[in-house]
Amino acid sequence: MNPKHTPIDTTGLTPEMRSHVLAEALPWLLHYRDKIVVVKYGGNAMIDEDLKRAFAADMVFLRAIGARPVVVHGGGPQINEMLKTVGLEGEFKGGFRVTTPEVMEYVRMVLFGKVGRELVGLINEHGPYAVGASGEDAGLFTASKRMITVDGEEVDLGRVGQIEHVDAESLIDLIDAGRIPVVSTVAPDDQGRIYNINADTAAGALAGALGAERLVMLTNVKGLYTDWPNKESLVSSLTPEQLSDLLPNLDSGMVPKMEACLDALRSGVQAAHVIDGRIPHSVILELMTTGGIGTMICPAGWEDIASPDINYREDLP
C-alpha cells in the first residue's frame, strides 16, 4: 500500500481492470529499483501449498524489477508438528513454550532444514536466486536469553532469545550478488548457546540493519485492527506516533509485529506494512498498487515525498 489511498478489493477484476492495475504499478516498479524490501514470511502463507508458491513468485517478481528482497521466516506450526511427532510437546509458561536444549535442536532443524529449505526450493524453481541462511551464519545475529514476567514473577523460558546485535555484512554480499536471502531466526549468544528468536522481532531488526526501504509483515488478518475483533476498526494507514499510542490496547498476537515495525521505522526504514498473507500475491498487491490491501505505518508527511507521480523522475528517490 502506498500513500493517500484506502485499500482496494482485488476480487472479481475484469481484464480491463487488471490492465489498469498493471499500468498503476509502473511508478512503483521504478520506485523499488535497487531498494531492499524485508518480508516476514508467516501465517497461512507458510502452510497452504498455493500460497507458498504465490509468495515465492512474488519474491522472484521483486528481484526481476530490480528490487532486493530479503525473507525472514519463523515456523511455529511446523515446529509444533515435529515436537508432537517426537513426543516433546513440553511445558508452557505464560503462554510461551519452554525451550529446552533438546527442544532447541528440533527447532533449529525445522527452521533451517525444513521451512527454509522448502522456500529456497520454491523460489529456485524460477532460477538460481535464493540462498538459505540463519542467524548463526557469519555472525548475522547475536542473541541473549529472553526472560518474561508472569503474575509478577520473572520466568526463564530456556532457549528463547532476543537479538542484541545484527551484523548484516554477509547478507549484503548475497544481495549485491543478486541473491534472495531466506533467513531462519535462530541465533547464538556470545558463549555459543543457540536460541530461538521471534521472527517478527528478527525481521524488524534486520530491516533496520540493512537500511531497508520497506518492511512487510504477513499475517492471517487483513491488517491492523485498533479494536479487535471489531472488523470496522481496520485502519489503512497510521503514523508511528499513532501506533505507539495504540500499542498497549492491541490484541496480544499483533503486539510483537507492531513493536518490530516501530523498531524498524526508528532505525530508518521508510515504511512498514501489515498484510493478509491468505491472499495470493499479497506482497505484490500491497507494494505495487496505490490502494494496497493492508495497513501501512509511515511518518506524517511521508506521502508528500513518496507520491507515485514523482517517481517517474529518476533524480528523486
UniProtKB/Swiss-Prot annotation:
An annotated GO BP: arginine biosynthetic process via ornithine
Binding site for substrate: 75-76, 97, 196
Entry keywords, A to Z: Amino-acid biosynthesis, Arginine biosynthesis, ATP-binding, Cytoplasm, Kinase, Nucleotide-binding, Transferase
Pfam families assigned to the protein according to its UniProt record, in alphabetical order: AA_kinase
Reaction it catalyzes: N-acetyl-L-glutamate + ATP = N-acetyl-L-glutamyl 5-phosphate + ADP
Organism superkingdom: Bacteria
Transmembrane segments: none
Keyword Nucleotide-binding: yes
Pathway: Amino-acid biosynthesis; L-arginine biosynthesis; N(2)-acetyl-L-ornithine from L-glutamate: step 2/4
GO MF, one example: acetylglutamate kinase activity
Keyword Kinase: yes
SUPFAM superfamilies, per database record: Carbamate kinase-like
Gene Ontology cellular component annotations, sorted alphabetically: cytoplasm
PANTHER family the record matches: N-ACETYLGLUTAMATE SYNTHASE (PTHR23342), N-ACETYLGLUTAMATE SYNTHASE, MITOCHONDRIAL (PTHR23342:SF0)
Role: Catalyzes the ATP-dependent phosphorylation of N-acetyl-L-glutamate.
Membership in a protein family: Belongs to the acetylglutamate kinase family. ArgB subfamily.
Protein name: Acetylglutamate kinase
Gene: argB
